Amino acid sequence: HEGSLVFLKAVIASKALEKSVQSVLSLLYHSPDSQTTTVPTTRSVTLILRSMPGVAYTTGSDLDDDHKEIHFSLDYIHGISESRKKDEIMGVLTHEMVHCYQYNAFGTCPGGLIEGIADWVRLNSDLSPPHWRKEAGGKWDAGYQHTGYFLEYIEHRFGKGTIRRLNEKLRIKKYHEKQFWTELVGRPVEQLWGDYSDVLDKEK
């Protein structure tokens, strides 16, 4: 598949995977030696490049959920513009790698928040694509960059390490929205979303 050649020319697979893991761990966790660091028990990540619709997805392998698989579309890779190939491949890999190493409140975390955290990590790895925009229409947990930029606002407002604390909170208990956000930053998420919307209005 021509997408395979594009991938192999753009990145060295082993280094690309290693770099994306480092980005995820440095943004979502304290240093490995810290007693407060509890990284998930992911034992392996297998990258599978294949022809398929869409962009990419991550799943547990048939062995068990500690072995992850990232499926990345060769058709999508082939269609990336020349100037964006490396950054887009690294951006997608980093986003998917978050799903291998993030917590989800025992399966109760909203999907939009899960995807927002992944794009927040991508954003903070300097891999955001040029078409991403901050927007405050709709719901805060619509996911992806929509939620990713909102999380970036929260990180700046409440201090570096806030999203790391959010991920840790998703490790230890189930997600009950009002309680979760009030315990994390002292106010409900709807209020934060309103504040964020006001900030974006002022930036226009």
PLM regions and their residue ranges:
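Second-shell loop/turn segments in exported
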Residues: 3-14, 76-84, 88, 104-108, ...
